[in-house]
Amino acid sequence: MKHSVHFGAGNIGRGFIGEILFKNDFHIDFVDVNNQIIHALNEKGKYEIEIAQKGQSRIEVTNVAGINSKEHPEQVIEAIQKTDIITTAIGPNILPFIAELLAKGIEARRVAGNTQALDVMACENMIGGSQFLYQEVKKYLSPEGLTFADNYIGFPNAAVDRIVPTQSHEDSLFVMVEPFNEWVVETKRLKNPDLRLEDVHYEEDLEPFIERKLFSVNSGHATSAYIGAHYGAKTILEALQNPNIKSRIESVLAEIRSLLIAKWNFDKKELENYHKVIIERFENPFIVDEVSRVARTPIRKLGYNERFIRPIRELKELSLSYKNLLKTVGYAFDYRDVNDEESIRLGELLAKQSVKDVVIQVTGLDDQELIEQIVEYI
């Protein structure tokens, strides 16, 4: 049986990446700092995934174990030394925190003379996640380790897409997920191209697919949340049941389509259908996806290269409409949740500084015209 190391034993790790690895006949070592989850994985050695659709079928994932990276980093290093693949689903902000441990694992492979090619895939909601992780890992590698990594360790970028809502169950390992899933890996950075995962797509140039996903699903999902919150919706489904909100989301996706077609020459009809499927996914009655989950961390989501500001910048450069995206940015700046640190911090910034200064600080923009346009909607 092949061996995998997966960083992040949360719902996405278990409910998406774990399912794919299991179906490809991998033993999975989940690496996390959540003792409850790690203990349950080691005690049971398996968990269940429920597919949120009519009939609600279940999948039992077996051959799993857990390692607490805080308490037993040496076990993680040992696992990396012998593994066939490494994946992550921990969130973009957490990637730097696993870099040193990954570097130690790579050094252990070098010392052991393990020259089997290994790919590390960051399955995160970000553009260039694996390469970002590699830049962090390189900081901790010796000169010999760097040479070894360049020869034998690949960091191919990946695009992943599956809605896994916040949930709580008596069984801490049980997880409910939507039926749809998409995992795309770029081939040009693979070090082990012979290891192909079933139910994973491989593309030479990943960038069009990452942008299609991030600018469509992530932008559309966040739009649903911020506009939904403005109108008092508690769940994404509730937001979509409001015709006014649904129409606004469709208008945002129309602007995204114009960008993707102009930039990557996507087929218009295929893209329209892709966006239609996205709306249907948001409307899944078997999933309770809280607005608070999707809207959280607004400062990060309003970043220069994130799901709103980047497409707005590029649409402006192409002289294409971005009015509906601007309106959504206004709702994002207005979003408040007492349980979300970033939304509270955003409110504090707006109370202490001018709106324009906050827009510049949060978005990183220096285009004065665009800054003024955003200010108008806050």
Curated annotation (Swiss-Prot):
Reaction(s) this enzyme catalyzes, per UniProt: D-mannitol 1-phosphate + NAD(+) = beta-D-fructose 6-phosphate + NADH + H(+)
GO cellular component, one term: cytosol
PROSITE patterns: MANNITOL_DHGENASE (PS00974)
Keyword match Cytoplasm: no
Residues that bind NAD(+): 4-15
EC number from the UniProt entry: 1.1.1.17
Keywords assigned by UniProt, alphabetized: NAD, Oxidoreductase
Gene Ontology MF terms: mannitol-1-phosphate 5-dehydrogenase activity
Entry keyword annotation includes Protease: no
GO biological process, one term: mannitol catabolic process
InterPro entries with a match to the protein in the record: 6-PGluconate_DH-like_C_sf, 6PGD_dom2, Mannitol_1_phos_5_DH, Mannitol_DH, Mannitol_DH_C, Mannitol_DH_CS, Mannitol_DH_N, NAD(P)-bd_dom_sf
NCBIfam families: PRK02318.1-3, PRK02318.2-5
Family: Belongs to the mannitol dehydrogenase family.
Annotated protein name in UniProt: Mannitol-1-phosphate 5-dehydrogenase
